[in-house]
Amino acid sequence: MNVLEFQSLCNSISDEVARLLVEVLKAPEDFKASDGNCALCIMNAAGETSMRLYGNNPVRQRQTAFNAHKKALQVWLTGYATGTFEKLVYTDQVSEKQFGLSRPELIGWLGGVEAKTQSGERLILAFSGMRGEQDVGILHQAAEKLKTFSIVKH
């Protein structure tokens, strides 16, 4: 996938997430997490990155963007969804050191996932700004709706 194709896919995913957010943020507990200010980070195997911010408060957007980017980078380095990786580390099934990480660096929150494009290329998606279950849930909903990528299950 070339850079233009990657950017087109990122735009498509970002637009779908924006459509889904309208409904998801109606739940008070999800809106309250960041007052509707959310961030989506998408990466490919080469490290090319796209970020989309949602909401209208730049300070909150910056915070959620930082978290989404940290989630994406952890998945990019490890190949494991956030939450899953931490479970593996803390049960001594995997060492964080083999990925150049230390335990204080681990994000610990759900919302970062490994995915594949239709052609089998690696894609990393991370979302932040709602409850962790919804951060990852909106990515699954976008995958189901678009069919241009699928979430990798570990």
Report each predicted region and the residues it spans.
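Juxtadomain coupling helices with adjacent low-complexity linkers
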Residues: 1-33, 122-154
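Arginine residue identity/basic-tract feature
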Residues: 19, 52, 60-62, 103, ...
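Structured interaction and signal-relay segments at domain junctions
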Residues: 33-101
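Generic detector of bulky aromatic hydrophobic side chains
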Residues: 47, 51-52, 64-66, 73, ...
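Sensory/regulatory domains in signal-transduction proteins
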Residues: 93-137, 144
